[in-house]
């Protein structure tokens, strides 16, 4: 639930319209790293190592290796997949 909340701040809900699907596969677009942080200054349970080490990328051609799709991200009018490991 906490991971989902963090992605709602940075990612748009998945929408499968024809226009958005076409913009996902633009040749020459580079993957973009996204830093995701959890926790508060007082050190609550959100400081768990598994959450602190979450690394996400906005990818145009799908997730790689051990990454999972966790939503979408946008740059301008282009839609990318939010892939995290």
UniProtKB/Swiss-Prot annotation:
How would you summarize where this protein is expressed among tissues? Paneth cells of the small bowel.
Supply one GO BP term: defense response to bacterium
- Domain of life according to the entry: Eukaryota
Keywords from UniProt, A to Z, are: Antibiotic, Antimicrobial, Defensin, Disulfide bond, Secreted, Signal
Indicate the principal place this protein occupies in or around the cell: secreted
Q: Where is this region: Disordered?
A: 14-46
May I ask which residue range the UniProt record assigns to the signal sequence? 1-11
* Cystine connections: 56-84, 58-73, 63-83
Q: Name one GO cellular component term.
A: extracellular space
Prodomain positions: 12-50
Subcellular location as annotated: Secreted
Q: What does this protein do?
A: Probably contributes to the antimicrobial barrier function of the small bowel mucosa.
- Which family would the database say this protein is a member of? Belongs to the alpha-defensin family.
Report the protein name in the record. Answer: Alpha-defensin 11
- Taxonomic placement: Eukaryota, Metazoa, Chordata, Craniata, Vertebrata
